């Protein structure tokens, strides 16, 4: 009987963990987002060759966020990070209209992978502070998100440097995690 209460207590009050993979084309803002969430400040970044990994504590959830470099030569390495991923954050530079088609191709290629079949998808439409940035509805359309079937997804307009929208995205991820457990 005590075990039932113990597991109930842990379910209600215990810390949950969620493995998050954050990917996107190079210069989309992934590393800036990671360290804004982790440190609450803007850091000077250089192109990520390989990955950064940090644990972000938010609303009693421990998010382990893997930020993987987005340069085209290293994108084939993304698949090595797919295993056990519960949430996928795909970061898009909303100001980069020339490469949004390329972003769509990479996203669809990843979502076709069997190891990501159960992962929820959060899209950060980043760089909303720039005057020519596409809004979330336009990014949704350009990425073809409405065509996704059998996958929970959400798009959040963000500005990594100010932090706008980042925690709203984590709220959605944490609610998805709670609904699955």
From Swiss-Prot:
Source organism superkingdom: Eukaryota
SMART domains in alphabetical order: ARF, RAB, SAR
Region (Important for the stable binding to the membranes) residue spans: 3-16
Disruption phenotype annotation: Death during embryogenesis. Some muscle differentiation occurs although it is poorly organized and little elongation or morphogenesis is evident. Extra A/PVM neurons are produced from the precursor Q.pp, which is normally fated to die, acquiring the fate of its sister Q.pa. Q.pa and Q.pp have almost similar size caused by a loss of Q.p asymmetric cell division. In oocytes, plasma membrane localization of rme-2 is impaired resulting in the loss of vit-2 uptake which accumulates in the pseudocoelom.
Any one Gene Ontology molecular-function term assigned to this protein's record: GTPase activity
Its membrane topology: Lipid-anchor
Name the record gives this protein: ADP-ribosylation factor 1-like 2
Main location class: Golgi
Entries under NCBIfam families matching the protein: small_GTP
